[in-house]
UniProtKB/Swiss-Prot annotation:
Transmembrane segments: none
Pfam families named among the record's database cross-references: ATP-synt_ab, ATP-synt_ab_N, ATP-synt_ab_Xtn, ATP-synt_VA_C
Catalytic activity: ATP + H2O + 4 H(+)(in) = ADP + phosphate + 5 H(+)(out)
Protein's name in the database: V-type ATP synthase alpha chain
Gene Ontology cellular component terms for the protein in this record: proton-transporting ATP synthase complex
Residues at which ATP binds: G238, P239, F240, G241, A242, G243, K244, T245
Function: Produces ATP from ADP in the presence of a proton gradient across the membrane. The V-type alpha chain is a catalytic subunit.
PANTHER family: H(+)-TRANSPORTING TWO-SECTOR ATPASE (PTHR43607:SF1), V-TYPE PROTON ATPASE CATALYTIC SUBUNIT A (PTHR43607)
Source organism of the structure: Borrelia garinii subsp. bavariensis (strain ATCC BAA-2496 / DSM 23469 / PBi) (Borreliella bavariensis)
EC number, as in UniProt: 7.1.2.2
Keyword annotations of the record: ATP synthesis, ATP-binding, Hydrogen ion transport, Ion transport, Nucleotide-binding, Translocase, Transport
BP GO annotations: proton motive force-driven plasma membrane ATP synthesis
Domain of life per record: Bacteria
Length: 575
């Protein structure tokens, strides 16, 4: 018999309930009000009273309303059909909700995440008599561009034997495809889909590896200077309007991964709508089909209830872990984790907990760490390797990187891509600061060469600050040349034109080739009669390199420009 309760207090989206029976932490419940069932989750248990955060607007909830507990944690449904979908934080398919409710979402309407009527062409890879454990493959269906493996549900803890498995054919997600038997002789029916709690990491693998293989983003400044590894973590903090969302969209389009999951948690509705409109029209460079075929979007805009923001982050990472179990490489982009932290701050305040810095809860760091730690590269039971790479954008107020959310994130991520107002105002894209950013991972360029080039940026910035005080006349010709070289590196290599078909995505081969050209210019000693001649010469080199960036790799125009560049360099080189 299900546990019942009644509402005894309402404070915003925090509801206090008097319980008649046993309940557990994070259990899902439904509040019956005005003919609707509103979904909520227990976040604190005290004696015979519990506090629950409601995933909907709480208008109309009154003292005495009946509450029914489900005895289940907040779960997601995992199975074929997740890709191409747009979900809210509770995994309701938004296009289906729009058909049922119109464009304005109604409270208390929850739909099944996966299409139960669609038939999937199942091809078996296991046979009767095979011994299996949780996470082992029974067969696969083709979903978009990936082989979607049908697995033994992750909650099955024993060893089983397959006693029945269907022949190849078309089946829906609810049809039985196999029967397995445990050691005690009890039989279990297996379908293509199952549920898994979002706050419990999926750990059905042999071992975790240290992330080492670079995840190519085809953005030069990231791959060369601040690389991200497959199974690694990175964050993109920056002030409003610095280009975080655009950088994430470019990364999702060009990254060397099988599946992209976008968690738009608390981002402005306009930006989410832009993503939803653009992605179906974008062409995946790897397959030539729509980018949505390998994408799943979880969106909770800033206008939706705050409690669902937290759910959207966990829903996204759980779906990512599910696809990792198939031996695929996943990229999860959370935009923005600051809004999620603000939702936590709101709930913490309502629970009257002792606040930490800037009123964020004292446990902010551990919650953020537990989310990023679910990323990783793993060896599966069958020897395949899968990875989940997590990138979270952070929106610190005023671009202040010292605030708690940024600092808590910096402690757990492996790469930091800090965007600055100064660079974005100067129309430099990506606006990643080459002076403040860092990475612990190995990139596509030799680290010693990259460090040498970066030293020019540091020196160039110091000389630039000096020139602002004393002018060009107050510095030596040698220092002025270092400054010009740093400007050349910045404009020709660090910046990219994401609207140009060639320059938007740069392969690792081309990055190595172009970096060597720039590196040789940095190492070359030049001789000039005065500073004006030096500036004119470096501007000519810069224009030549920019034209090369917009030319197809090693075609006639590219080779001609490279030859002209080489002649220019030899003209002023000190032998």
């Amino acid at each position: 018999m299900k546990t019942k309760g009644k509402v005894v207090g309402v404070n915003g989206n925090l509801v206090t309930i008097e319980v008649e029976g046993s309940v557990s932490m994070n259990e899902v419940l439904f509040i019956k009000t005005a003919g609707r069932n509103l979904k909520a989750e227990i976040i604190r248990v005290r004696g015979n009273e519990v506090d629950a955060q409601v995933f909907e607007l709480t208008k109309g909830i009154s003292v005495g309303d009946v509450v029914e507990f489900t005895d289940k944690l907040l779960t997601v449904e995992l199975g074929p059909g997740l890709l191409t979908q747009v979900y809210d934080g509770l995994q309701n398919p938004l296009p289906e909700l729009a058909i049922q409710c119109g464009f304005f979402l109604e409270r208390g309407v929850y739909l099944r995440p996966l299409n139960k009527d669609k038939k999937w062409n199942f091809k078996k890879t296991a046979k009767v008599g095979d011994s299996v454990i949780a996470g082992d493959f029974l067969g696969f269906v083709i979903e978009g561009t990936v082989h979607h493996q049908i697995m033994i549900p992750f909650y099955k803890r024993d060893s089983y034997k397959i006693v029945e498995i269907v022949n190849d054919g078309n089946y829906s997600i609810d049809e039985q495809i196999a029967v397995i038997e445990d050691d005690s002789g009890m039989k279990h029916s297996i379908t293509m889909s199952f549920h898994w709690p979002v706050k419990i990491p999926i750990t059905n693998y042999k071992e975790r590896l240290i992330p080492s293989e670079p995840m190519l983003t085809q953005t030069r400044i990231i791959d060369t200077f601040f690389p991200v590894a497959k199974g690694g973590t990175f964050c993109i903090p920056g002030p409003f309007g610095a280009g975080k969302t655009v950088l994430q969209q470019v990364t999702s389009r060009n990254a060397d991964v099988d599946i992209v999951i976008i968690a738009a948690c608390g981002e402005r509705a306009g930006e989410v709508v832009e993503t939803l409109k653009e992605f179906p029209e974008l062409i995946d460079p790897k397959t030539g089909k729509s980018l949505m075929d390998r994408t799943c979007i979880i969106c909770n805009t800033s206008s939706m209830p705050v409690a669902a923001r937290e759910a959207s982050v966990y829903t996204a990472i759980t779906i990512g872990e599910y696809y990792r179990q198939m031996g695929l490489d996943i990229l999860l982009l959370a935009d923005s984790t600051s809004r999620w932290a603000q939702a936590m701050r709101e709930m913490s305040g309502r629970l009257e907990e002792i606040p930490g810095e800037e009123a964020f809860p004292a446990y902010l760091e551990s919650v953020i760490a537990s989310f990023y730690e679910r990323a990783g590269i793993v060896v599966l039971n069958n020897g395949d390797i899968g990875s989940v790479t997590v990138g979270g954008s952070v929106s610190p107020a005023g671009g202040n990187f010292e605030e708690p959310v940024t600092q808590a994130t910096l402690k757990v991520v492996g790469a930091f891509h800090g965007l600055t107002r100064e660079r974005s105002d100067a129309r430099k894209f990506p606006a990643i600061s080459p002076l403040e950013s860092w990475s612990k991972y190995k990139g596509v360029i030799d680290s010693k060469k990259a460090e040498y080039a970066r030293s020019f940026l540091v020196k160039g910035n110091e000389i630039n600050q000096m020139m602002k005080v004393v002018g060009e006349e107050g510095i030596s010709s040698e220092d002025f040349l270092i400054y010009l070289k740093s400007e050349l590196l910045d404009s020709c290599y660090l910046q990219q034109n994401s609207f140009d078909s060639v320059d938007a995505a740069v392969s690792s081969e081309r990055q190595n080739y172009m970096f060597d050209i720039v590196y040789n210019i940095l190492k070359t000693n030049f001789e000039f009669s005065d500073k004006l001649q030096a500036r004119d010469f470096m501007n000519e080199l810069r224009q030549n390199l920019l034209d090369m960036n917009l030319s197809s790799f090693k075609d006639y125009k590219f080779n001609k420009l490279e030859q002209a560049l080489s002649e220019l360099v030899n003209l002023k080189k000190v032998i």
